């Protein structure tokens, strides 16, 4: 394997992406106590995923067939492509509700820090903390009712 700057960058990016996947899918459900509710949310950036995976595919094809670059770079690009295909198309964003707070976008928000909640007409639950505004885009009305029931029970 050739360890030039490109391969080092791709290797670090692949490791960080794998750590993100493991944290999101394995660590969050197990940390901070029992999971009360896990709700899949509406996806909002589907086209971003298409563009990003398309760029990775173009880089792979360019490196493999046109530039005849190092094989190690092609392997690292292929691994990155597989990881991002999983992230963009198979994994969905979710809110994980625990007994003491909720996980959203990899961060934990205790129920005690929530100052205000608003519900929009199109099914968006807006949660305001002292520093941030979280927008939970529920997939269905039933999911929204489940989230509100958890908030009324545990906050």
From Swiss-Prot:
Signal peptide: none annotated. The keyword Cell membrane applies. The chain crosses the membrane at residues 8-28, 46-66, 70-90. The keyword Membrane applies. Keywords: Cell membrane, Membrane, Transmembrane, Transmembrane helix. One of its GO terms (cellular component) is plasma membrane. Its main location: membrane. Belongs to the UPF0266 family. This is UPF0266 membrane protein lin0773. It comes from Listeria innocua serovar 6a (strain ATCC BAA-680 / CLIP 11262).
